[in-house]
């Protein structure tokens, strides 16, 4: 069971980190290349990027909750208490992902619609569009900073998960839960 838990934990961390690398360096920037802008001009390329980004956040939520479940299962079966650093890495990345997907992304969506109000058949003054463009740039920078923190944190988490660590001391998983006392 412990080898399965180890394999599961490494798989979750690798998928989580790998998806972040793929989206950050390959998929995300592809929406804003000259080739893409010829196929799908602004603001529609940004709208398509938003759709993909929403799925990216769902993947982050799933991986985050699976990583937390793995930490709990590893503690229950091996008796090893997860280190604070590992718990903070998983909790921090999951928290940033929830913040990005549930608060920041809708904010950017709204600002993009005001910025390109004419394309979306909305009414907005030139000042509102200009303010939305400025705010969008600032919040997009915040989003990129958060993504950088997520990237580095997941890299550290993956490095921690692939290390075998020390065996549990003075704790037998069977005795921990009193399962050796069969009546």
State the predicted function of each range.
Residues 97, 104, 125, 132-135:
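Amphipathic alpha-helical coiled-coil segments and their boundaries
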Residues 2-84, 109-133, 173-176:
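Interfacial loop at the N-terminal end of multi-pass membrane proteins
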Residues 11, 15, 65-69, 145-166:
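Selective detector of the "anchor" transmembrane alpha-helix that sits immediately C-terminal
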